[in-house]
């Protein structure tokens, strides 16, 4: 097995199970034209996020790391008509591209974009005592990932689902000398190991985005 096979399998399932999607394809094209890095979730992973949000009956979703809004669109589509998605993005240029993508997808009214350091925004959301989120998707800088998850728990409720992307990092998570990103994920795993408030697991993935994985945690109490 090699990366060519992983890519071919992804393409097969995209064609068989998902098909073409003008709004999502437009979002990817606009993001590329604006110079955004191509680090968004894959098509199949986006559909997975959509199904997780749909299956959980999420009415409020929090996303940390907007980029061009590709995963945001997948998640927002799973919301009911009166649902809301709050997404946090550090870079104003990325946020501007994402907002245009949301308009083209017909989802702008469901999505609230906050620009600036995520930890600061999360602090403000806690201070404002916003309604709890049913699902949280975290796809942001990994050195801060333990703090993001702890904030997510504070903004959630029993039954909420927290999904963290890029936790395997090509196997760097078990490297003898992990880099800062892998170290952040390891710190998160160590913290989760001592928690009774959350039940968590991690899944390795291969595909068009290489070798990586997701961590999923359910807020128990």
Residue ranges and their predicted role:
Residues 1-21:
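N-terminal auxiliary segments of SAM/dcSAM-dependent transferases
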Residues 4, 39, 43-221:
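S-adenosylmethionine/decaboxylated-SAM
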Residues 8, 12, 34-36, 102:
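Residue-level signal for pocket-adjacent positions within structured domains
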Residues 18-33, 39:
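S-adenosyl-L-methionine
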């Amino acid at each position: 097995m090699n990366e060519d096979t992983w890519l071919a399998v992804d393409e097969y399932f995209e064609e068989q199970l998902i098909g073409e999607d003008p709004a999502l394809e437009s979002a990817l094209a606009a993001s590329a034209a604006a110079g955004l890095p191509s680090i968004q979730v894959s098509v199949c992973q986006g559909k997975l996020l959509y199904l997780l949000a749909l299956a959980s009956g999420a009415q409020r979703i929090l996303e940390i790391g907007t980029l061009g809004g590709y995963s945001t669109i997948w998640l927002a589509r799973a919301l009911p008509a009166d649902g809301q998605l709050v997404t946090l993005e550090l870079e104003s240029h990325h946020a501007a591209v994402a907002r245009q993508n949301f308009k083209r997808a017909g989802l702008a009214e469901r999505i609230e974009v906050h620009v600036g350091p995520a930890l600061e925004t999360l602090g403000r959301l806690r201070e404002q005592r916003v309604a709890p989120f049913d699902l949280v998707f975290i796809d942001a800088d990994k050195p801060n990932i333990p703090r993001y998850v702890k904030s997510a728990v504070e903004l959630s409720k029993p039954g909420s689902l927290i999904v963290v992307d890029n936790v395997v990092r090509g196997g760097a998570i078990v490297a003898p000398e992990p880099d800062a990103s892998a170290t952040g994920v390891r710190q998160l795993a160590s913290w989760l190991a001592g928690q009774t408030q959350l039940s968590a697991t991690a899944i390795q993935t291969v595909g068009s985005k290489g070798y990586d994985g997701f961590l999923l945690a359910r807020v128990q109490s």
